[in-house]
Every structure is written in C-alpha cells, then in structure tokens.
A protein has these predicted regions:
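Hydrophobic residues within membrane-embedded alpha-helical segments of Major Facilitator Superfamily
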Residues: 14, 21, 76-77, 83, ...
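Residues that define the loop-to-transmembrane-helix transition and helix capping
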Residues: 32-33, 94, 120, 176-179, ...
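Residue-level recognition of pore/gate-forming positions within transmembrane alpha-helices
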Residues: 12, 39-43, 101-105, 127-130, ...
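Hydrophobic transmembrane alpha-helices of multi-pass small-molecule transport proteins
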Residues: 46, 110, 121-139, 269-288
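Selected transmembrane alpha-helices and immediately adjacent juxtamembrane segments
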Residues: 4, 148-180
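C-terminal transmembrane-helix exit sites in multi-pass transporters
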Residues: 84, 103-125, 135, 251-272
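Membrane-interface interhelical linkers
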Residues: 1-71, 75, 81-91, 141-154, ...
Length: 288
C-alpha cells in the first residue's frame, strides 16, 4: 500500500474519532470552556509541528490579505468548535455529526445564493443524496432530548459552511505552508474561544472535568493535530484528487465511535441513510 494512502486513512480515522473523544472530555464542562481547552491542545500540537518543520519564520512572511483570510477562517473555526461542543454536550454524536456533515452542501448553497455560481446536475444529485441520507438518519425519535443539540448542530453547520466557502474562495499564498496556516488559524480560534469562556464566566466549570475527561480532551486535540499532519504528508506524497474521497470514511468512523464509546444505538434502517449520505459526499468531492 502506498505511504500516502496510509496517511490519508489515519487522518480519516482520527477525524472520525474526535467527536466521541470530545464529548467524553467536555460532558461536565461549559461548552465555551470545553471548546477553548480543546482548541488550546490543538494549538500546542500545531505549533509543535511548525517548530519541528522549522517553518516559524514563515509567519513573518504572511501578507495582509492572507492574514485577513486566516483571521476570518480562524474565527469561523472557533465558532464551529464552540457550537459543536454545545451540541455534543446536549445530544448524541450520531445525531449531531450527520447535520454538521452537511457543511459542503451549505457552502455550495451560499455560493449559489451570493455569487450566482452554477450548480451542475451531477452536483445537485449528490447534494440531494446527502440531504436524503441525513433526513433518514435524523428521522428517528429523539428520546429524552431537549432539542438544544439540534440548534447548536445547525449553528455549527452554518459556521462550517461559511468557513468552507472562505477556503474555497481564497487559499493562503503559496509561500505559507499548510502547517503555518493551520497554526495561525488555530491561534485565532483559541483567542476567540477563551474570550467566549471569559465573557460567559464558564471557567469555574473546569472543576467538574474528571481525570478521564482531561485525558479525552487531550486525545481529541491530538486527534485533530495528527490528522492535519497526516493530511499534509498525504498531499505531499500522493494524488490530491483521491484524498478528499478517502476523507469520507471519517463519517462512518464517527458513528462507529459513538457506538463504541457512548453505546449509542442506531436502527438498521438508518444504515441506508448512511450509504446515501456517503454516496452524496463521495460524488461531490470527486468534482472538487
């Protein structure tokens, strides 16, 4: 097996397991504090990668336009993590992730609405497949739920769609490596989230985090950090046109992680929804 495929698969596996790790880590914390702690772990890992690659000097080469992009993208990333944390605290992983997974559809929708971009028949069919699959997954009754998770999941979806659209419209200058862009973006996210935690007076909730919670918080941050590192290695060594389709496997891994770590059950009928959603994602990513 080619080395880049191993990196791509490891990235997808870690990305899929992250929601289950994060839910375990922050279940007794306030959402803002949980997201801030998670982002801090990711930042430490991202900064370590930059130092390991000896690319810290590139930060001084960031132009104003690129910096503006990174600030906007980082702020949106912080909002995504905040809303995702709140959704996972109030709801199950296998209910939250199918909704947040629609961010690519949201990005295309915003692009068509604001910029009047054309939508091919193929892409429209893929979007319909993804929407239908998600509808089947979410058609189960929400036993004991209060509905808050759905509100935060949709907020995370919209913020993630805006971030995806930002990344589609403007990519960092070629002189800036992916690792440096990730580190700067995550630094912005961390600042935004700690400000939210301070303004929300949620720091005291740190006392409620158990020893296991701290361990899983660190694991969640490390999962994203290692996934980013694997992504950059896979892109460097392999065919980038195959990387995004491989990343689709993060979706079923997330649902499997919910079953393993949180005993979240899924009816047999929902499996058809997973297949439809995967087909829609795979088809859309092939056209990117």
């Amino acid at each position: 097996m080619a080395e880049w495929i191993v990196y791509a698969v490891v990235s997808a596996l870690l990305t899929g397991l992250m929601p289950s790790f994060l839910k375990t880590g922050i279940k007794k914390a306030a959402p803002a504090l949980g997201a801030a702690l998670f982002s801090s772990v990711v930042l430490l890992f991202a900064a370590g990668v930059v130092a390991m690659e000896a690319r810290a000097g590139e930060i001084l080469e960031i132009g104003n336009e690129t910096l503006l992009y990174l600030v906007l993208s980082g702020a949106l990333q912080g909002v995504v993590w905040l809303c995702l944390s709140a959704a996972l605290i109030h709801g199950n992983v296998n209910r939250v992730i199918p909704i947040t997974n629609l961010h690519v559809c949201g990005a295309f929708g915003i692009s068509v609405w604001l910029f009047h971009t054309t939508l091919s028949v193929w892409k429209l069919c893929c979007i319909l497949l993804l929407l239908l699959g998600t509808l089947l997954l979410e058609s189960r009754p929400d036993k004991g739920g209060n509905g808050k998770w759905a509100l935060f999941a949709f907020l995370a979806l919209f913020a993630s769609a805006a971030k995806t659209l930002t990344d589609m419209l403007y990519l960092p200058e070629s002189v800036i490596s992916v690792s440096v862009a990730n580190a700067v973006r995550t630094a912005i996210s961390t600042v935004v989230l700690w400000c939210a935690a301070l303004l929300g007076k949620s720091l005291n909730s740190a006392k409620r985090i158990t020893a296991d919670g701290w361990i899983f918080l660190v694991l969640a941050g490390m999962a994203i950090g290692v996934a980013w590192l694997c992504d950059s290695r896979a892109a460097l060594l392999g065919d980038s046109s195959y990387l995004l389709p491989i990343s689709c496997t993060a979706f079923p891994v997330a649902l499997l992680g919910a079953r393993i770590f949180h005993k979240e059950e899924m009816p047999a009928g929902a499996m058809f929804g997973i297949l439809l959603a995967l087909a829609g994602m795979f088809g859309m990513l092939l056209e990117l």
